[in-house]
Amino acid sequence: NGERYIIPLKNISTRERYDMPGRGLDALGYRKESDGSITLLLAEAKVSEQKSNPPSVVDANKDSLYKSQKIYHDDESMVLQRLTEYLRHISVTEDTVALGCLVLLIQAKQKEKYHITYGCGLVRDYTCLDKDKDFGKFKSSIDEFRPGRVNFGIFSFTEKTIAETVELFYKKVI
């Protein structure tokens, strides 16, 4: 609907430094929709200067964006685990109420009242970028995430090294 997601706490800021990457979701957010439903955002980013397109962090590695997001798509208990873990780290606000409602809706299997967006970010050296191929399975096998939605973004800055790009990315999200 064009509205931005609310991300009450960026997981990345509590567990990572730009020079020491962690594993798993980097951000968890939500958006209230005009029809009264809530959309959950499960977001993860990976960095690659690998010359192949797509780089293995997209869909080949064991912990690739594709494989880790498929785990959340295929296993609601993992989504619930992340949501409840996340709720322990934020103070009681409107955000807590919205995310708590998501927990209840998922547990009650009221799928018409919530949606999931799988957010994927690829931080890429501009010399390696191929905007047609870097999406990998997220383009060729997008139907595997239905009824969810995939948002895939590539972050690349001309004239910036991968280290400079990563530093810019982390300064923005932390």
Q: Where are the regions that the model predicts?
A:
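A short acidic/basic microdomain associated with nuclease active sites
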Residues: G2-M20
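Short secondary-structure capping micro-motifs at structural edges
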Residues: S13-E16, L28-R31, V103-Q107
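Short, catalytically relevant binding-site loops at active-site mouths
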Residues: T14, V47-Q50
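Conserved catalytic cores of phosphodiester-cleaving nucleases, focusing on short active-site segments
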Residues: A27-G29, L40-V47
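Acidic, metal/cofactor-coordinating or nucleic-acid-engaging core segments within structured domains
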Residues: K51-D130
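Charge-rich, low-complexity intrinsically disordered segments
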Residues: K137-I174
